[in-house]
């Protein structure tokens, strides 16, 4: 099988219901910020569940193989929450498990974790959210723009505490809040977003030196 170097139509593996719309939107926003306007994820992302489920024997491989077999995509991207797991060590584990599948189908397979959860991205974007949706009555602090939100557990709860007039609901608000994100600001402060941007650049590139991303090894 001929390897398609520069991928444009990734099949997405996502965690839950809200992610099926929010993750493709975020990927498109990040790609467009890099000028990659023709990178458009396939419709109907595959819900694969959380990391503990994917860690079970054969589960990760089953989902990645299913995504590789879809005729509407030229690549695969997994985007799930990392919660309290180490994103680097989990990336090493997962890329090792899917490498053979990527080579068998000659498709690029990228893995991206949101540390700690998808809503953590919104905590890095509180100012932008407050400007786009002022009616929610945002409570902002002076250190919001410099704080490392990836160390904070319970991002959904923190998000709710920041709004006086609104209650966050994942399936209703994920896409809405993604629309407020400034990608350049986000990638300069949030390592998960920067990793996603680099993954998208790798996916789009003509390089076929590696069919899995990130290209991590132990040690």
What residue spans do the PLM features occupy?
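C-terminal accessory helical subdomains adjacent to catalytic cores in phosphodiester-
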Residues: 2-9, 20-49, 57-219
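Short hydrophobic beta-strand that contains or immediately precedes a catalytic carboxylate
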Residues: 12-15
């Amino acid at each position: 099988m001929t390897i398609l170097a520069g991928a444009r139509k990734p099949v997405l593996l996502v965690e839950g219901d809200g992610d099926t719309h929010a993750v493709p939107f975020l990927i498109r926003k990040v790609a467009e910020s890099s000028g990659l306007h023709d990178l458009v994820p396939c419709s109907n992302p595959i819900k694969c569940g959380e990391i503990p489920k994917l860690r079970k024997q054969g589960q990760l491989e089953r989902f990645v193989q299913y995504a590789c077999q879809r005729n509407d995509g030229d690549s695969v991207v997994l985007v799930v929450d990392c919660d309290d797991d180490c994103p680097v060590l989990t990336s090493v584990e997962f890329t090792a498990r899917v490498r053979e599948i990527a080579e068998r189908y000659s498709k690029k397979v990228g893995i991206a974790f949101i540390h700690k959860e998808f809503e953590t991205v919104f905590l890095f974007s509180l100012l932008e959210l407050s400007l786009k949706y002022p009616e929610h009555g945002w409570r902002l602090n002076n250190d919001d723009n410099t704080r490392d939100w990836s160390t904070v557990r319970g991002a959904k709860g923190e998000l709710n505490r920041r709004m006086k007039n609104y209650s966050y609901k994942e399936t209703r608000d994920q896409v809405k809040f993604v629309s407020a994100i400034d990608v350049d600001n986000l990638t300069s402060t949030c390592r998960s977003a920067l990793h996603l941007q680099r993954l998208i650049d790798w996916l789009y590139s003509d390089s076929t030196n590696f069919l899995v991303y990130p290209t991590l090894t132990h040690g």
